[in-house]
Amino acid sequence: MENLHWEPLAPACRVLVSREHTFNTDTILLAHFAAPKHKERCIDLGTGCGTIPLLWQTNYTPRHITAVELGEQAFSQALRSVSENGYEENIEVIRGDIREIKKIIPHPTLDLAACNPPYKAVGAGLRNPDERMENARHECTCTLEDVAKAGRDVLRFGGRFCLCQRPERLADAMNVFRSYGLEPKRLRLVQQRVNTAPSLFLLEAR
């Protein structure tokens, strides 16, 4: 692992980041948009370095959080971050593929799922020669359809799925969610500056 260092998330919480696996404003916005209610059972699909579960556990009162990550380095960072903050009893970090989520969560029992997925479809934009960076930016190992299917498979009836994406993918996201029985209920558009076009959307579906 290269360039590992700790970044503060809150006065009593920090996360281990690297060049390949870090967090940004989108991550923070999604964590708070998808704020868990008291005693909810939650999952973060493709947790990266574990920022969203750490923020959930620090700021809210969920019953339990499952954090799923496919990449070896990101998984290791998330695991170390959970341990560093003393959250082992509250957050379970699992190395796994969300396309095979039923191997991890066999039944639809969870209250809340969140995902900060790759923003670009395969073939859109420039490719990154670094495989880890490429997987984080393009839908190489996880498509919008994979994300929606995973949400459907883990959420109980009435459970909430929260996602962030680029505005140009909004119609795709709504259509895919509906095809998996997840009806969009809440939408927030994010602008970087006043009088500029939105750069991000946050979507909740049930």
Predicted region positions:
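Mobile active-site "lid"/loop adjacent to the S-adenosyl-L-methionine
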Residues: P117-D146
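Conserved beta-strand segments of alpha/beta enzyme cores
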Residues: R14, H64, N90-E92, E183-R186
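Short, structurally constrained coil/turn elements
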Residues: L9, P36, Y87, R178-G181
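Core SAM-dependent methyltransferase catalytic element
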Residues: S199-R206
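Conserved Class I SAM-dependent methyltransferase catalytic core
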Residues: E20-F23, T141-P198
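Conserved SAM/SAH cofactor-binding pocket of Class I
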Residues: H32-L126
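Residue-level signal for inorganic ion chemistry
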Residues: L30, N116, V147, A205
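Class I SAM-dependent transferase core
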Residues: M1-K37
